[in-house]
């Protein structure tokens, strides 16, 4: 506010929605980092690599769930802004039906073909076996993880980010505790890490569902919204798919890209794979502000559009981009200075060579993450309006068109690890430029008029 980046009231509303989501992200990413450290201590670097190889497939839960959840927040926020609360119920029921239909088949695929899928990424027999074990078990948590994304977006769409923070952060803590018991207490290794993830996600889903239906939660009191489970589950499916399919594609870009990316990183050797997995976990932690600002932007812009206040929607979008970049600069500087002790903490006793490579990758990520602030925050208004195709194309171009080729050049030429450093930078630069350009054109406002509560069917 003092730097004149954002108007005071908009800063307050943005912060109210963003900080709980940021804390939730930190809790979840910290849990992931702790998982990696636990697996590293219990199984070694092969276990870290195995979990890393399984991660792209687990990421399908967040690709499908996150895509439909983008449609959820767009519809819920616009209908809430227009005071059409009955229409909120329909959006939530349809969202739940779609994510369950999308994710249930993945359980069977990963259970029966998990080993074959992980083997696509590496010829390291031990890492492949461990990754396949992890994937077969964790697959049962995919529908729960996707439903949790929808549940959290419902609350954020109605101006309440604290309840999702409490539930999902609590789930992350429960996950870490369960993993410690299962990995070390019962000596289940990577299977224990996967089982802990399944159980904790199922617990959070149950709490979300019971709270939304009852309209209240013990200890948290009345909720801002109550969902009637009776009624059609298909009414908003078409709109959800129109908005959510490009977001699923955008999420799948990285999930799918991880497969060739990890295969390319494997050409550097198992030590670099372990370092890359560690760096990616730390990247996830650094990226948590973007989740908060992106969702805050989607909610606030969506509510303004639902009220027909397009100028207010634009002001929120533009100022949240500035706010996000300022926060990213500060957080990236802190991580850059303390990169070595941070990596050593997450490495779980890894070798000095692994730690050294991971530190260099994290340092490169600190530069790239600032542009992620632009990309993610600029995508928020586009998601809120239903203009979700542009961020999908920009993400695909950045990763498949630039980042992966640079990584491959690093693995096959004298460019070496510099190829991975440049890949981090390309991954965020291209979407940042293209997403902000699309936001600046104002075409997203035109798209939003097709999805507002008073729009013709």
Name each model-derived stretch.
Residues 30, 42-45, 79-82, 157-158, ...:
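Helix-loop interface residues and adjacent transmembrane-helix termini in multi-pass membrane transporters
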Residues 5-42, 56-71, 75, 103-107, ...:
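N-terminal transmembrane alpha-helices
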Residues 48-108, 145-164, 273-333, 337, ...:
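Small-residue-rich hydrophobic transmembrane alpha-helices
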Residues 39-59, 126-131, 190-195, 239-243, ...:
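Interfacial/gating helices of multi-pass transporter permease domains
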Residues 1-18, 76-141, 190-244, 301-368, ...:
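Short alpha-helical transmembrane segments in multi-pass integral membrane proteins
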């Amino acid at each position: 506010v003092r730097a004149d980046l954002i108007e005071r009231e908009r800063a307050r509303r943005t912060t109210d929605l963003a900080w709980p989501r940021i804390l939730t992200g930190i809790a979840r990413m910290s849990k992931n980092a702790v998982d990696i450290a636990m697996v590293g201590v219990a199984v070694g670097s092969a276990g870290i690599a195995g979990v890393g190889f399984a991660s792209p497939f687990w990421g399908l839960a967040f690709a499908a769930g996150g895509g439909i959840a983008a449609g959820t927040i767009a519809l819920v926020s616009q209908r809430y802004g227009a005071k059409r609360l009955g229409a909120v119920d329909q959006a939530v029921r349809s969202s739940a039906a779609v994510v369950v239909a999308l994710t249930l088949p993945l359980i069977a695929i990963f259970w029966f073909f998990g080993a074959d899928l992980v083997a696509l990424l590496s010829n390291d027999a031990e890492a492949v076996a461990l990754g396949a074990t992890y994937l077969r078990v964790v697959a049962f948590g995919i529908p729960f993880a996707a439903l949790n994304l929808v549940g959290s977006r419902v609350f954020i769409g109605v101006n309440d980010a604290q309840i999702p923070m409490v539930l999902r952060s609590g789930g992350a803590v429960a996950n870490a505790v369960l993993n410690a018991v299962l990995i070390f207490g019962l000596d289940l290794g990577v299977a224990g890490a996967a089982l802990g993830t399944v159980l904790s996600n199922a617990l959070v889903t149950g709490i979300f569902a019971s709270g939304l239906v009852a309209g209240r939660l013990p200890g948290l009191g009345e909720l801002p919204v109550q969902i009637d489970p009776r009624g059609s589950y298909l009414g908003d499916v078409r709109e959800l798919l129109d908005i959510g399919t490009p977001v699923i594609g955008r999420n799948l870009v990285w999930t799918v890209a991880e497969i060739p990316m990890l295969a390319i990183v494997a050409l550097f050797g198992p030590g670099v794979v372990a370092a890359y997995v560690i760096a990616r976990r730390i990247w996830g932690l650094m990226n948590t502000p973007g989740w908060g600002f992106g969702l805050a932007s989607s909610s606030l812009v969506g509510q303004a559009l639902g009220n027909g206040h397009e100028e207010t929607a634009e002001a929120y979008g533009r100022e949240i981009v500035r706010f996000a970049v300022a926060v990213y600069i500060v957080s990236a500087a802190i991580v850059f200075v303390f990169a070595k002790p941070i990596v050593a903490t997450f490495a779980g006793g890894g070798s000095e060579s692994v730690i050294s490579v991971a530190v260099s990758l994290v340092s490169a990520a600190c530069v790239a993450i600032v542009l992620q602030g632009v990309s993610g925050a600029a995508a928020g208004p586009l998601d809120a309006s239903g203009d979700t195709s542009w961020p999908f194309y920009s993400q695909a171009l950045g990763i498949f068109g630039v980042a992966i080729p640079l990584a491959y050049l690093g693995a096959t030429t004298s460019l070496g690890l510099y190829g991975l450093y440049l890949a981090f930078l390309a991954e965020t630069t291209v979407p940042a430029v293209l997403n902000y350009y699309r936001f600046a054109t104002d075409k997203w406002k035109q798209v939003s008029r097709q999805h507002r509560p008073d729009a013709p069917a």
